[in-house]
């Protein structure tokens, strides 16, 4: 994906206004100032791109990726958007054939198994051809093979881009094996996922008709003054969380809603509204990548606020390791001044922990090593 060039361009940045930080369940308090979100042009000189990717992932764990070769107008993206939009436009009973999400399949409002809800409906698919083909029979009964082909084509494009970004990250960090991260995600048993989220219009603060129906056409309006969970004039589309995997690649239409929790110029963390850009792909560092780099990279907390008068459609590819993969900080990230921060664990163990907790829980904190933990020194040798 990276095309060498003769010159090294200046790093691009997008300055966005800060959204009000969450103060309490009943609402928000105002914030101010501007926050800079890095933009990385993948078509630039490779060495410069590698440094920019590493810097952005260490600073915020998030960046806007352009020049990646998969714009919204590209056939691979346009076909997926059309296919998934057609699915979400179906009658509730038809969509329910692909659900309920457990966790894969079609879901409405419920996120996970512990009571988290959001103003959305979604498809969650395992990113391998056999799994997609199996699920496609319930998503597109008329032509499942066509749906499978569209989804798998998109997955391959995202897998290629994720590997390129991870390899650049390995180079930027100066790892002995720059491809270490990408090899985890391309293993035959890798647990990669594709998620498509559909957020209905919320200009009057709507709520989805739940009861396992998710009837988008019969949205019930509620007054803003009655909404205890309203934030910044909207409702929680997808609650605050970090992604547990290695890396996430998000592409969305031109409807805003994504917010990231990042420090401002004074170091104070606040929620920042990310400007929409259908031509860009937004890259998130996940919990596993934070653990692999011994906390050097940041797994960013983010959320979606449903405030728009038009539907928001977003597609996220999650690059993940195999279930049996042991996650342990790489030796080059452990030093006398930066001892091992997390105990080693398997991806299966981490997923089990994740499914036992609420969405907003800081899962990685449960795997931290105490300062006086005797395993700290011994594990540092691994």
Swiss-Prot record:
Keyword terms: Dioxygenase, Iron, Metal-binding, Oxidoreductase
Swiss-Prot/TrEMBL cofactor(s): L-ascorbate; Fe(2+)
Residues the record lists as binding 2-oxoglutarate: 199, 312, 314
Binding site for Fe cation: 241, 243, 302
Lineage: superkingdom: Eukaryota
GO annotation terms (biological process): gibberellin catabolic process; gibberellin metabolic process; response to light stimulus
A GO molecular-function annotation: metal ion binding
Tissues in which the UniProt entry reports expression: Expressed in roots, shoot apex, and in the basal region of leaf primordia and young leaves.
EC code(s) of this entry: 1.14.11.13
One Pfam family from the record: 2OG-FeII_Oxy
Domain Fe2OG dioxygenase: 189-321
Cofactor, how bound (note): Binds 1 Fe(2+) ion per subunit.
Catalytic activity: gibberellin A1 + 2-oxoglutarate + O2 = gibberellin A8 + succinate + CO2
Other comments on record: Plants overexpressing GA2OX1 exhibit extremely dwarf phenotype and are unable to achieve phase transition from vegetative to reproductive growth.
Role: Catalyzes the 2-beta-hydroxylation of several biologically active gibberellins, leading to the homeostatic regulation of their endogenous level. Catabolism of gibberellins (GAs) plays a central role in plant development. Controls the level of bioactive GAs in the shoot apical meristem, which regulates the vegetative to reproductive phase transition. In vitro, converts GA1, GA4, GA9, GA20, and GA44 to the corresponding 2-beta-hydroxylated products GA8, GA34, GA51, GA29, and GA98, respectively.
Family: Belongs to the iron/ascorbate-dependent oxidoreductase family. GA2OX subfamily.
PANTHER family xrefs: 2-OXOGLUTARATE (2OG) AND FE(II)-DEPENDENT OXYGENASE SUPERFAMILY PROTEIN-RELATED
Protein name per Swiss-Prot or TrEMBL: Gibberellin 2-beta-dioxygenase 1
Organism of origin: Oryza sativa subsp. japonica (Rice)
């Amino acid at each position: 994906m990276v095309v060498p060039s003769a010159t090294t361009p200046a790093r691009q940045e997008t300055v966005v206004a800060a959204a009000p930080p969450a103060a309490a369940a009943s609402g928000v308090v105002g914030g101010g100032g501007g926050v800079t979100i890095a933009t990385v042009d993948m078509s630039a000189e490779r060495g410069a791109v590698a440094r920019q990717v590493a810097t952005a992932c260490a600073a915020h764990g998030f960046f806007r990726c352009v020049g990646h070769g998969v714009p919204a107008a590209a056939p691979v993206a346009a076909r997926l958007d059309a296919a998934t939009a057609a699915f979400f436009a179906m009658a509730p009973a038809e969509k329910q054939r692909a659900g309920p999400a457990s966790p894969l399949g079609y879901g409405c409002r419920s996120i996970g198994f512990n009571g988290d809800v959001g103003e959305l409906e979604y498809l969650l698919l395992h990113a391998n051809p056999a799994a997609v083909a199996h699920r496609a029979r319930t998503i597109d009964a008329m032509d499942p093979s066509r749906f499978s082909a569209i989804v798998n084509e998109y997955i391959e494009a995202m897998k290629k881009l994720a590997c390129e970004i991870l390899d650049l990250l390995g180079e930027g960090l100066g790892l002995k094996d720059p491809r270490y991260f990408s090899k985890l995600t391309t293993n035959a048993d890798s647990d990669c996922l594709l998620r498509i989220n559909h957020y209905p219009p919320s200009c009057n603060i709507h709520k989805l008709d739940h009861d396992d129906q998710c009837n988008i056409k019969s949205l019930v309006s509620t007054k803003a003054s009655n909404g205890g969970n309203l934030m910044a004039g909207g409702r929680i589309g997808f609650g605050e969380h970090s992604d547990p995997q290695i890396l996430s690649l998000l592409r969305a239409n031109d409807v805003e809603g994504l917010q990231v929790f990042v420090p401002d110029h004074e170091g104070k963390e606040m929620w920042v509204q990310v400007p929409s850009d259908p031509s860009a792909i937004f890259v998130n560092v996940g919990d596993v990548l934070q653990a692999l780099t011994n906390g050097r990279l940041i797994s960013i907390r983010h959320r979606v606020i449903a405030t728009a008068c038009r539907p928001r459609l977003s597609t996220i590819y999650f690059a993940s390791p195999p279930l049996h993969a042991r996650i342990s900080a790489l030796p080059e990230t452990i030093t006398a001044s930066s001892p091992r921060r997390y105990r080693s664990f398997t991806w299966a163990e981490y997923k089990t922990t994740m499914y036992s907790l609420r969405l907003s829980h800081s899962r990685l904190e449960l795997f931290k090593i105490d300062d006086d933990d005797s395993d700290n020194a011994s594990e540092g040798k691994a």
